[in-house]
Design a protein with these regions (language model features):
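Extracellular/luminal recognition modules and glycoprotein regions
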Residues: 30, 38-54
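A conserved hydrophobic secondary-structure block that centers on an alpha-helix together
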Residues: 228-233, 317-367
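Catalytic and substrate-binding clefts that recognize carbohydrates or anionic sugar/phosphate headgroups
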Residues: 2-24, 46-51, 59-72, 80-308, ...
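Short secondary-structure junctions
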Residues: 32, 105-110, 408-410
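Non-catalytic, glycine-rich low-complexity segments
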Residues: 15-40
Length: 601
């Protein structure tokens, strides 16, 4: 669809021909405010709009009123919640893991004729609501008066003012942002939007592993995890619904719904968020330094655990080693030629059939898996194994998985969107919303960990079967959250068996920082691939993550994906880049061992 450059269509996702049964409801001036259990509850009426480029109230429809809740925490954190009669505020979420520093601070409200002042009990201002209409010097009736609005200012740390975008319009009917609104389709609430004011010189960072310039201002992102298929495009493996602002605040949108985030892109005056869920749960975090703000975010969603010491050594891999003899030959040569190496990774080739993940070694090429692993351990190597969270149609476990609903039953056939380099038909996605499926998956990994495997590569997880019946939630909500549930399961069983908490993961969402570590996906072995990886890693680190790596010297080659030769300079410079990342792993579609680059090794 061609852009219209109008907010209603390009950001709020209404069809330009307005052929669908959809409606937009804009927040108006609050009608009342009260205290409840230390929170401030604000009754906000919403007026249905006549849909067009020029918005106007649809006075034939009665207003609908819903409660906006303000909650204050220590660490300079203010929370806004509105469920539009569909959802209730909760701290019971996979994404949330409050630290001991997060304490609720009771709020109180003082009402005057023109404003409602919200403070903590120590008298520090935390929010202000203007309820008096703006002063006018009326001389013209050419245009209608502006509609009522929600004029709310937040002061999370008692100092910095973060305003909702109450008046982002050209003429009164021509809006470029709305402070608060929801949308209905076929009479059902299904989307919600919230906007903050943005300043002309404001800069932004974060939002996950964003392969973009360091200042994200002027850009709009669709927060939907998908196979990035490289690091030089708008797709990304790791969306995080959190951004940092140069005005020394950050915002965490507590949702796993597909969302849209515009950082002064749709309108240069507003940061806008649109969720494909009729709920908004927003934490605004302010501080004197970026470190304070990131700490506040981690106070809400969890801190990265420390990976084991051995993981900070050098990992060697390629796609892929195919036999115990090949691996032993490479490991022996690494030692003989004095190349440091601590972990050897086996990618897709350790199964009976390449890419056919059955969580079992090929009996011919790896006749004694446990002895093979223990032998490598004696040489100073730990073993990492590749796998993925899907069960193929011809996998050994398919009947068991289907019979017990360990994979979500499909409602119809769909093609894979990810980088499936095999001809396999992935028949289903392991349903981590179902505890029995999670335990089944853990048992599959435990068999490998009991042999001496020390790390599981939790590849993929960005895409799931969307036309499937998951036990715990709709696929539209599970899509982004899946990475967290998947990595949590692998991390927990690895720590239970080996004592070391670690995974090697590609996808991510809010909370995944608790289960390190992550790597940057399938970058090109080129200068622009290295630059894209670096940009992604920097934004990822500014999204609450501490441990991150990337394939040295890039994953694939060009023009031939598998077979082009990696430039010596790229290999050398990418190695240096890897040394100064938290973790370094050589990996890619062809040879990565240093003796294949004699001019520099």
């Amino acid at each position: 669809m061609k852009p219209t450059n109008y907010h209603l269509f390009d950001f709020l996702d209404f069809d330009p021909d307005l052929s669908r049964d959809e409606s937009l409801w804009k927040a108006y001036k609050p009608t009342s405010v009260y205290e409840k259990d230390g929170d401030i509850c604000i009754n906000v009426p919403f007026q249905k709009q006549v849909l067009s480029n020029d918005m106007a109230p649809d006075t034939t429809s009665p207003r609908e009123e819903y409660t906006l809740v303000i909650r204050q925490y220590t660490s300079g954190i203010t929370r806004l919640f509105i469920g539009f009669g569909e959802e209730s505020m909760t701290d019971q979420s996979e994404m949330l893991q409050f630290s001991d520093r997060v304490k609720k601070l009771p709020l109180q409200v003082t009402q005057t004729e023109g404003e409602w002042l919200i403070t903590t009990q120590d008298g520090i201002q935390r929010a202000l609501i203007h309820v008096k209409p703006p002063v006018l010097d009326r001389w013209s009736e050419l245009l209608p008066d502006p509609q009522e609005t929600l004029d709310l200012r937040l002061y999370p740390d008692g100092k910095r003012e973060i305003r909702l975008a109450a008046y982002d319009h050209f003429s009164p009917p021509r809006y470029d942002a709305l402070p608060l609104a929801f949308c209905k389709r076929n009479g059902v609430k299904e989307r919600a939007t919230l906007s903050f004011e943005s300043k002309p010189d404001e800069c932004f960072a974060g939002t996950g592993e964003r392969f973009a310039k360091m200042d994200l201002s002027g850009q709009t992102f669709f927060l939907k995890n998908q196979d990035g298929q490289g690091v030089n495009n708008r797709r990304t493996y790791k969306n995080i619904p959190f951004y940092l602002s140069s005005r020394m605040y950050g915002t965490f949108y507590h949702t796993c719904a597909h969302s849209k985030l515009s950082l002064a892109g749709q309108s240069t005056r507003s940061v806008q968020f649109l969720s494909d869920q009729a709920m908004l749960d927003v934490f605004v975090i302010a501080g004197d330094t970026m470190e304070e703000i990131l700490r506040g975010y981690r106070d809400l969603t969890g801190y990265p655990s420390m990976p084991p010491l051995w993981s900070f050594g050098i990992w060697m891999s390629r796609m892929t080693y195919f036999s115990a003899d090949e691996v032993n030959e490479i490991c022996d040569r690494m030692r003989a030629e004095h190349y440091p190496c601590d972990v050897i990774h086996l990618d897709t080739g350790w199964f009976k059939t390449d890419w056919l993940c059955e969580w079992k070694f090929n009996e011919e090429r790896f006749p004694d898996p446990k002895g093979f692993i223990q032998g490598l351990k004696k040489k100073g190597y730990r073993v990492s194994l590749w796998q993925l969270p899907y069960v193929a149609e011809n996998a050994e476990q398919i009947d068991e998985a289907r019979k017990n609903d360990y994979i979500a039953p499909l409602t119809k056939k769909q093609d894979s969107e990810g980088s499936n380099f095999s001809a396999l038909d992935y028949a289903g996605t392991i349903d981590f919303t179902y505890p029995k499926a999670t335990e089944w998956y853990k048992r599959l990994l435990k068999n490998l960990l009991d042999m001496g495997v020390t790390c599981i590569k939790t590849d993929f997880g960005e895409n799931i079967h969307m036309d499937a019946l998951y036990k715990g939630m709709k696929p539209e909500l599970l899509n982004n959250l899946y990475a967290l549930l998947y990595q949590k399961a692998a991390y927990e069983i690895t720590k239970d068996v080996t004592g070391d908490g670690i995974v090697w993961a590609r996808s991510a969402w809010a909370g995944c920082q608790r289960y390190p570590l992550h790597w940057g996906g399938d970058s090109c072995s080129s200068w622009d691939g290295m630059a894209g990886s670096l940009k992604g890693g920097l934004h990822f680190g500014l999204s609450g993550f501490a441990f991150w790596s990337h394939d040295v010297p890039g994953f694939h080659t060009l023009p031939n994906f598998m077979n082009s030769i990696v430039d010596d300079d790229v290999y050398m410079r990418w190695t240096q880049f890897g040394v100064f990342s938290s973790h370094i792993r050589y990996h890619g579609t062809n040879k990565r061992e240093p003796w294949h680059y004699p001019a520099i090794a």
